[in-house]
């Protein structure tokens, strides 16, 4: 799956339709998706602009802690695309799964495990 937000983003966009190219069962397909198809509200690109690495880390922590809004919706849609491909499930189901993983705290726990592992590896250097 390759996606291109029609607002020049290299990911699924919340501010414009997204063009998708996908190979499924050996067949190449092209289609367009919109945030509204997945129950998301369209927003402006400016609402999704990050900041410094520290600010982006804080935004990520807030999303994984349950904060709703455009940033979370962008994370959900793009995580859903990865789940759609990896688990071979419909995008609608992948969106629900991404939301469940965030809402249950499993995504936050996985991030904490990753941070712990990378810190341990850094200490060994």
Where are these regions (language model features)?
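Glycine-rich anion-binding loops and their surrounding alpha/beta cores
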Residues: 1-125
């Amino acid at each position: 799956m390759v996606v291109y937000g029609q607002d020049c983003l290299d990911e699924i966009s919340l501010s414009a339709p997204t063009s998708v190219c996908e190979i499924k069962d050996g067949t190449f397909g092209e289609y367009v998706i919109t945030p509204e198809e997945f129950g998301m509200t369209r927003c402006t690109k400016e609402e999704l602009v990050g900041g410094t690495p520290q600010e982006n880390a804080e935004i990520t922590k807030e999303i994984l802690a349950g904060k709703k809004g455009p940033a979370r919706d962008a994370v959900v849609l793009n995580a859903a695309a990865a789940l759609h491909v990896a688990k071979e499930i419909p995008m609608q189901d992948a969106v629900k799964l991404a939301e469940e993983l965030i809402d249950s705290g499993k995504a936050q726990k996985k991030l904490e495990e990753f941070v712990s592992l990378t810190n341990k590896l850094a200490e060994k250097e």
